């Protein structure tokens, strides 16, 4: 029996290895097929019916079953501590992410600053972005979990204008009839126990 799942890269890297190991011990006869990538691409694949379970970040217009799995604070990462009031004057290393997340970052930025970021580098590779930060070339804006494998960088949690941490939510989406497929029901129930 097979259960196709799609997930975002960050969740695939930091959570899915442990989840899949535990799931396979509990359900050794259920085979999992997983694909990872950007939230907007994976969500589109899910809507097209290619996958039974979708783990994505951010706000999506999903009206069937969903479960909040995780909240990750958004941070400004830099080699040295930052004065957040002066952020527009620091060199910015822009990680070209999915459009939904970029909108969140843009909304946060322009709620706090009148000037655009002083962008010096743009990259679509998160590891490249973090290496540039690690070398002291500038700062970047990412979820806190993205920097956990990069030593010697400092995260500063972004806050709303009300002073609350800015969080990025990770959701598991599945359809109302998920219980009709044994493998999908097993995985959804397993995730409900863990999260």
Where are these regions (language model features)?
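Generic preference for hydrophobic
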Residues: 5, 34, 53-55, 76, ...
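Residues embedded in well-ordered beta-strands
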Residues: 67-68, 75-77, 139, 169-173
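Central regulatory/effector-binding core of bacterial HTH transcription factors
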Residues: 1-61, 122-123
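A late-sequence structural motif
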Residues: 15, 157-195
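Hydrophobic hinge/microswitch elements
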Residues: 38-39, 114-159
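Secondary-structure junction motif
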Residues: 91-114, 180-181, 188
């Amino acid at each position: 029996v097979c259960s196709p799942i799609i997930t975002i890269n960050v969740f695939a890297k930091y959570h899915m290895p442990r989840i899949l190991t535990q799931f396979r011990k509990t359900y050794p006869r259920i085979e999992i097929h997983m694909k990872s990538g950007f939230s907007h691409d994976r969500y589109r694949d899910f809507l097209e019916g290619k996958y039974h379970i979708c783990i994505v970040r951010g706000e999506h217009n999903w009206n069937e079953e969903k479960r909040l799995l995780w909240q990750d604070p958004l941070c400004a990462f830099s080699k040295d501590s930052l004065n957040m009031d002066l952020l527009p004057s620091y060199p910015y290393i822009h990680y070209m992410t999915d459009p939904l997340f970029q909108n969140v970052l843009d909304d946060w930025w322009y709620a706090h600053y009148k000037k655009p970021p002083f962008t010096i580098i743009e990259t679509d590779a998160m590891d490249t972005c973090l290496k540039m930060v690690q070398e002291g070339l500038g700062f970047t804006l990412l979820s806190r979990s993205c920097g956990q494998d990069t030593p010697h960088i400092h995260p500063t949690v972004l806050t709303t204008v009300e002073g609350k941490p800015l969080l990025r939510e990770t959701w598991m989406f599945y359809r109302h009839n998920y219980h009709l497929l044994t493998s999908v029901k097993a995985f959804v129930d397993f995730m409900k126990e863990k999260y």
